[in-house]
């Protein structure tokens, strides 16, 4: 009897192990083919950009320094592509000085909410941290909650599980690699915070196809690496946009705005839209 029980348990363990192996293999196969299966969409026709997005971007009281970046960042296109709407609860991960945070705040409006997250700022980036803190003092951004928390901390976002509509990370996923952050933990936290059907939007400077993370010091990352890692968290890639593509960029120079100088805003960038099932 005991031998039968042991044999049964061993057989069950083998079957369970095989099921996990099969699931991981399926995920790997899915991740390796998804990019090709999701063609990039063309820019959204201006007439199809919602008026509330145009109003937010063109608001007279937006900072002039923000507006000077618009041509290189195409915020109307990005916000429309991500489906940002009034009343939504959203998060801006690694918000930096708050350019994207303010746009999100203006679009979601008084019935919406924005979590603006930044990790601790090292000494050389204290000026950005100060700009972020100063921006959030604006009464017009009272729907924004500042989240000063390391990516490795538990409870990255204070939002209740399954409560957010959209999470955005704008040109900073590569920095997770540079700082040695546990990206699987970050993506899992985003997955937990989003509601079913919620969107995870990622924009970043592209490295050459197939380069993986070897060019990370250029502040660039291979698009497929991001796709694979985010899908491993359970997300499905549903859309890609070409609006920030710059084929003239040979992807050999440092994309960081602190180094790019006059070339800032001209990097070849991918925009990925993932959805939580």
Where are these regions (language model features)?
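Conserved class I S-adenosyl-L-methionine
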Residues: 87-96
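A short glycine-rich, Lys/Arg-flanked "PGG" loop and its adjoining helix->strand segment in the class I
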Residues: 105-106, 182-196
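A short acidic, Gly/Pro-enriched loop at the edge of an enzyme's catalytic core
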Residues: 156-167
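Core SAM-dependent methyltransferase catalytic element
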Residues: 248-277
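Conserved Class I S-adenosyl-L-methionine
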Residues: 136-138, 213-240
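S-adenosyl-L-methionine
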Residues: 127-158
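Conserved beta-strand signature within the Rossmann-like core of class I S-adenosyl-L-methionine
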Residues: 197-206
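Class I SAM-dependent methyltransferase Rossmann-like catalytic core
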Residues: 53-79, 85
């Amino acid at each position: 009897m005991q031998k039968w029980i042991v044999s049964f348990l061993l057989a069950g363990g083998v079957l369970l192990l095989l099921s996990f192996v099969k699931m991981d293999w399926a995920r790997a196969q899915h991740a390796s083919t998804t990019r090709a299966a999701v063609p990039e969409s063309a820019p959204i026709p201006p007439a199809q950009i919602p008026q509330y997005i145009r109003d937010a971007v063109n608001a007279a009281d937006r900072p002039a320094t923000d507006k000077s970046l618009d041509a290189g960042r195409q915020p109307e296109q990005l916000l429309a592509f991500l489906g940002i709407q009034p009343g939504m609860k959203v998060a801006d991960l690694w918000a930096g000085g708050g350019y994207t945070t303010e746009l999100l705040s203006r679009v979601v409006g008084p019935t919406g909410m924005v979590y603006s997250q930044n990790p601790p700022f090292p000494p050389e980036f204290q000026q950005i941290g100060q700009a972020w803190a100063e921006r959030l003092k604006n009464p017009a951004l009272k729907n924004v909650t500042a989240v000063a928390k390391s990516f490795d901390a538990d409870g990255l976002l204070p939002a209740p599980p399954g409560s957010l509509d959209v999470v955005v990370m704008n040109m900073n996923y590569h920095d997770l690699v540079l700082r040695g952050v546990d990206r699987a933990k970050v993506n899992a936290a985003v997955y937990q915070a989003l509601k079913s059907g919620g969107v995870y939007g990622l924009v970043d400077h592209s490295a050459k196809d197939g380069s993986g993370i070897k060019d990370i010091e250029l502040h660039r990352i291979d698009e497929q690496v991001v796709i694979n890692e985010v899908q491993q968290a359970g997300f499905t890639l549903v859309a890609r946009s070409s609006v920030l593509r710059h084929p003239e960029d040979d992807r050999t120079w440092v994309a960081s705005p602190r180094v790019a100088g006059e070339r800032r805003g001209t990097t070849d960038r991918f925009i990925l839209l993932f959805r939580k099932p």
